[in-house]
């Protein structure tokens, strides 16, 4: 059997994976995928139905305009530093054209991420 993949949860590790592959690591599920496994945010935790997985890949509206906008750019979000229990306030936001940002305070402030070592 293949060795169990280590879940990628740290903000810089998630960002580096996105920079390298253009997508989230395999340990992320969209909200819809998690719901299909039995997740209900009012009744249980993601870790109850999908241990080792985090929520990520859903569209982020950027309605407040706090992230850079460009024609055709789409934004997506992913939980950061999630291991179990309730989802925290940390998120990674990544764009369809290669930008990555981190928020530690649930979309109040954002820090642009860069590949490790750059």
Q: Model-derived features: where do they sit?
A:
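Short, solvent-exposed linear motifs at loop/edge-of-secondary-structure regions
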Residues: 22-41
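Generic detector of bulky aromatic hydrophobic side chains
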Residues: 7-8, 17, 26, 60, ...
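Low-complexity, glycine/serine/proline-rich disordered segments
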Residues: 1-23
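Functional cores of ribonucleases/endoribonucleases
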Residues: 35-118
